[in-house]
């Protein structure tokens, strides 16, 4: 069963365009697939969970989105031994895809996914903290402090949207880091 979880809003809407390119390849090759478009934050988690719980023995689960969408999908997955995971990168950073060596046009990436006969093991990390209901998985990195603050701000940043439209999305993180450094409150327990 070939399933796609699509975040059309990734990279300020470029995800929808990239998905159309990938979908055209699937239709041209007459490949059977199911696609699910995310509607809200956290939806990719639910979709991945439901797909993995459907009872199929061989699931090919492909994310069309950025690192955030991929993270949601990985955390929603169950029965990992039955799932082959892939990603068509459409985000502004695409650290996961880069780390996995995924490069090329959407057409090239979908071609590789369809023709790949070899499985690769992907390491995942797990983190939990006080008040955490369930440990979270991560594929690339986990941050705390300033790093986590910048990533959280980037999720809702109008600056990110504007820079993505100018094809400068990676500068979002530099801008938000500098901005956050000037807004942090510093405390010291040291005596004066």
Where are these regions (language model features)?
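ATP/NTP phosphate-donor binding region
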Residues: 1-61, 71, 75, 108-110
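Glycine-rich beta-strand-to-loop/alpha-helix junction loops that act as flexible
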Residues: 8, 64-66, 90
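Catalytic core of DAGKc-family lipid kinases
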Residues: 3, 79-84, 91-188
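Active-site phosphate/pyrophosphate-handling residues
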Residues: 68, 72, 149
């Amino acid at each position: 069963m070939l399933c796609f979880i699509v975040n059309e809003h990734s990279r300020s809407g470029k995800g929808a365009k990239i998905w159309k390119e990938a979908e055209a390849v699937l239709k041209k090759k007459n490949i059977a697939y199911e696609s699910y478009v995310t509607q809200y934050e956290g939806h990719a988690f639910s979709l991945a969970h439901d797909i993995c719980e459907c009872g199929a023995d061989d699931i090919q689960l492909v994310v069309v989105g950025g690192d955030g969408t991929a993270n949601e999908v990985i955390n929603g997955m169950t029965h990992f031994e039955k799932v082959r995971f892939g990603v068509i990168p459409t985000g502004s950073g695409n650290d996961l895809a880069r780390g996995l060596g995924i490069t090329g046009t959407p057409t090239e990436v979908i071609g590789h996914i369809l023709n790949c006969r070899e499985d690769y093991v992907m390491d995942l990390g797990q983190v939990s903290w006080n008040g955490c209901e369930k440990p979270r998985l991560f594929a690339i990195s986990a941050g705390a402090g300033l790093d986590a603050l910048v990533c959280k701000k980037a999720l809702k940043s109008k600056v990110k949207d504007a820079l993505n439209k100018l094809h400068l999305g990676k500068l979002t993180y530099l801008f938000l880091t500098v901005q956050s450094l000037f807004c942090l409150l510093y405390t010291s327990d040291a005596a004066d």
